[in-house]
């Protein structure tokens, strides 16, 4: 066993016969009020943190897109959580890695995450090579071993997923959100071995003490980054990730049968007997993702190729294709409509990617945040890729 390896027994309990409380509170009277209410229903803040204790916060910041797009966790919610933990005398630390097709530094800078953490009294955890530990997953069906951040093995975790659909997994809520605590090697393996079973295996290993699903603005359609924003105005919380996720599915109008990793989790861990408290969950039917079989096969194949491509090139294969503008959701300037007004340049966090003289986008520099699409008054910037040619408006 290597210096960065350890064996770990599964900590996921069998939940059959246990009553799991799931709380849903509307945010229309303020996110702070909703946050305090859900936590109070679950036993209060002292149930989840103690003075002097380090608490790992795991938001969903999968890509450089703001929370009002439905793609990422609200920074307002994250800041409030940091504040509450600081008030208890705890030490909140933020841990997140983006999707493999996005560069870590660019994503962090898009959210100004280092400054955000510092200004709110939290620590942004480094993700250097010595921060990862290889762990054996006892009982793992397909994912037998995972490289996870050392902090999640040493401290309690509060999980902050987003209420949204996902073109590969159907939905991404609490259980899926834990992929962000994994090294890219493990993320790749999960896609190659089978994403749904792998998510279940990862949740055998890592069990947050609290799951807070951010449903202020959700996402429907071809999520989890470039779907359609959907205003919901709800926080859903539970100590049990599966119970919280099933409540999220209920709100989204999605059956557990449509989300294989949650179905498998129910079979493995038992479907929790839930006690629902707070505001009534009124079904708000989300548009389902619509991937073709060819898309799903191609997406998985990307990760198979990446296992050889990345060691040779030092860049992930899907990121390489996106940077070349070969695949992926991306902005496109319609030369017949563009009037070179410059509004896109003013809002773009990477303006060097826009060439208004030639009306082109340099995808090697583009973050694919699509801020330019919203800023373009004449609607000259379109969206190309699997999400279809459409506007964000």
Which residues are covered by each model-predicted region?
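N-terminal and secondary-structure boundary signal
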Residues: 2-335, 339-341, 345-358, 363, ...
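Cysteine-rich micro-motifs
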Residues: 366, 370
């Amino acid at each position: 066993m290597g210096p960065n390896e350890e064996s770990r027994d599964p900590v996921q309990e069998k939940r059959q016969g246990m009553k799991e409380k799931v709380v849903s509170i509307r945010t229309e009277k303020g996110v702070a009020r909703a946050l305090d209410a859900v936590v109070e229903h679950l036993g209060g803040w002292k149930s989840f943190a103690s003075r002097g204790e380090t608490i790992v916060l795991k938001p969903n910041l999968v890509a450089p897109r703001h929370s009002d797009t439905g793609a990422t966790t609200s920074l307002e919610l994250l800041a409030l959580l940091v504040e509450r933990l600081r008030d208890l005398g705890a030490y909140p630390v933020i841990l997140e890695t983006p999707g493999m097709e996005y560069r870590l530094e660019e994503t962090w800078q898009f959210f100004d995450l280092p400054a955000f953490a510092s200004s709110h009294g939290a620590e942004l955890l480094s993700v250097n090579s010595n921060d990862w530990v290889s762990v054996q997953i006892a009982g793992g069906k397909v994912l037998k071993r995972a490289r996870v951040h050392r902090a999640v093995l040493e401290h309690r975790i509060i999980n902050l997923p987003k209420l949204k659909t996902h073109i590969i997994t159907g939905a991404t809520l609490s259980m899926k959100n834990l992929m962000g605590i994994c090294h890219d090697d493990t993320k790749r393996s999960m896609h190659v071995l089978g994403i749904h079973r792998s998510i279940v295996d990862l949740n055998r290993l890592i069990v947050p003490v609290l799951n807070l699903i951010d449903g202020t603005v959700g996402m429907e359609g071809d999520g989890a980054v470039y779907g359609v924003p959907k205003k919901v105005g709800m926080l859903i919380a539970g100590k049990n990730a599966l119970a919280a996720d099933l409540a999220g599915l209920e709100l989204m109008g999605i059956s557990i049968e449509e989300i294989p990793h949650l179905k498998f989790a129910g079979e493995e861990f038992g479907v929790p007997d839930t006690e629902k408290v707070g505001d009534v969950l009124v079904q708000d039917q989300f548009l389902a993702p619509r991937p073709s079989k060819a898309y799903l096969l191609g997406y998985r194949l990307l990760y198979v190729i990446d296992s050889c491509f990345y060691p040779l090139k030092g860049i992930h294969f899907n990121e390489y294709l996106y940077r070349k503008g070969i695949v992926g959701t991306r902005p496109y300037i319609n030369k017949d409509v563009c009037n070179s007004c410059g509004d896109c340049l003013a809002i773009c966090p990477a303006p060097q990617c826009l060439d208004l003289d030639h009306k082109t986008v340099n995808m090697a520099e583009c973050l694919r945040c699509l801020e330019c699409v919203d800023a373009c008054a004449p609607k000259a910037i379109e969206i190309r890729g699997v999400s279809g040619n459409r506007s964000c408006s």
